[in-house]
Each structure stands twice: as structure tokens, then as C-alpha cells.
Amino acid sequence: MKQVRIGLVGTGYIGRCHAIAYAQAPTVFPLDAELVLEYLAEITPELAEKKAKEFGFNRFTGDWRDIVQDPNVDVVDIC
């Protein structure tokens, strides 16, 4: 199955909603691809690490530009 790798910038209210929605989407919608919570950015590396663990992202960063420049990220969701 094809993968769509998600990069999420920001974990405030909308970022939290989007992270939960990406994780639950396969239980609600028939998808042709697996959504992978790949990369999360927050204002500091410490907060990014905490939120990545909380939401199940594979990687984290304190600089949103890392996500935008990463060729392994298919979707950048700016929250």
C-alpha cells in the first residue's frame, strides 16, 4: 500500500485536532494509502519531542524548515 508521510507544524488546538484526525482517518474513511505520522515541528526541540511521543510521530524538530525541506515528507500541514 502506498504511504503518505505527514509533516505537522504546530501542536496547539488545531495541530492537536489534525494529529488525532490523521491517526483515526483509516477507521472512518476507506483510504488508498497509509497515513504515516512522519515529522513534527514545534517551537523548541524539547516540546517537539514531547508532542511527537504523545501523538506518535516518527521524528521531531524545533525548526519547521526541516520538515519543509525533507524529501521524505509528502504533506506539510501548518497549524
Predicted features along the sequence, with ranges:
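N-terminal glycine-/serine-/threonine-rich beta1-alpha1-beta2 phosphate-ribose binding loop
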Residues: 1-79
